[in-house]
């Protein structure tokens, strides 16, 4: 997940800078997002240390296995955060602000406040996924894309998160239930959860089509073709899951949906560079 967040931020910077992309700035954008995401992951693991030991998929993490103490993990996470904020502030104060908002949303809103209390944890915690796109955008001194496009792309990440995480949660439903984490598939039946996932996918695909009908986003035929093809694939695999809900099919949907954002952002970068050429 960290790699994907770094990629969306880097792609956002390239798309915003166009042919004036600075390699050094691109490295700083990528590094600051990696450090910030790693910081959020580390502090999140610190908060989750008592439940990570319960779940098979998380008990191999450094804190549950004793490779690092909780106190040292917390200190390490804060050092990573400080480095991330320093680098992103060098890029732009707004980049640093976006980084801080993303960190706080993931660690405080998602991990600390909501993860153990509400199925909406990944929705309200999903705003953290928006921020790397803004970090990359605000690092551009003279963006060729409007801010509305950066916000649009950031919220495409937001709308992608429910299908991605809830498909995973169906596969590991029993582990979440054992850890008393109220993920959607824990509090709803498998078939009902699949229906909700399908609805969120339809919303995401419909949202991705908005620039097809609004030239103000400054995205053109490469983006249009990319989201139409990928949207069709996403709808098809969700229809397949709806036809026969199962943990195995949900796991397949999770794996197929994972590269969706990668290809969308590749399409965005290609679209912008070709249009400016």
Language model regions located:
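Membrane-embedded alpha-helical segments that form the functional core of polytopic membrane enzymes
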Residues: 7-47, 57, 81, 97-108, ...
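Hydrophobic alpha-helical transmembrane segments in multi-pass integral membrane proteins
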Residues: 134-145, 204-211, 260-277
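Transmembrane alpha-helical segments that form the membrane-embedded catalytic/substrate-channel core
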Residues: 34-43, 104-111, 154-173, 205, ...
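Small-residue-rich segments of transmembrane alpha-helices in multi-pass membrane proteins
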Residues: 4-10, 61-62, 124-140, 254-267
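Intramembrane alpha-helical segments
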Residues: 70-142
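Multi-pass membrane catalytic core of lipid/isoprenoid biosynthesis enzymes
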Residues: 56-97, 189-214
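Interfacial loop-to-transmembrane junctions
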Residues: 235-263
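Cytosolic, membrane-interface loops and tails of multi-pass inner-membrane proteins
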Residues: 47-68, 166-194
């Amino acid at each position: 997940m960290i790699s994907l967040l770094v990629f969306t931020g880097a792609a956002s910077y390239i798309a915003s800078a166009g042919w004036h992309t600075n390699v050094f700035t691109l490295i700083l954008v990528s590094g600051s997002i990696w450090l910030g995401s790693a910081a959020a992951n580390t502090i999140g693991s610190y908060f989750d240390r008592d439940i990570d030991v319960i779940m098979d998929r998380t008990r191999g993490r450094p804190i549950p296995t004793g490779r690092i103490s909780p106190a040292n993990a917390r200190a390490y996470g804060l050092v990573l955060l400080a480095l991330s904020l320093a680098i992103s502030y060098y890029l732009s104060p707004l980049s640093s602000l976006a980084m801080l908002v993303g960190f706080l949303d993931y660690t405080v809103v998602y991990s600390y406040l909501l993860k153990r209390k509400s199925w909406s944890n990944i929705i309200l915690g999903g705003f953290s996924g928006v921020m790397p796109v803004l970090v990359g955008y605000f690092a551009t001194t003279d963006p060729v894309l409007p801010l509305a496009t950066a916000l649009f792309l950031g919220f495409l990440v937001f709308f992608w998160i429910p299908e991605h995480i809830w498909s995973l949660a169906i596969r590991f439903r029993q582990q979440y239930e054992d850890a008393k984490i109220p993920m959607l598939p824990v509090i709803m039946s498998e078939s009902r959860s699949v229906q909700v996932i399908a609805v969120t996918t339809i919303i995401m695909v419909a949202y991705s089509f908005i620039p097809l009908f609004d030239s103000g986003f400054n995205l053109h035929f490469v983006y249009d073709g990319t989201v139409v093809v990928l949207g069709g694939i996403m709808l098809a695999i969700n229809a397949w899951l709806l036809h026969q809900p199962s943990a195995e099919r949900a796991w397949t949907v999770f794996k197929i949906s994972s590269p969706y954002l990668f290809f969308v952002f590749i399409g965005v970068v290609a679209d912008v560079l070709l249009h400016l050429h």
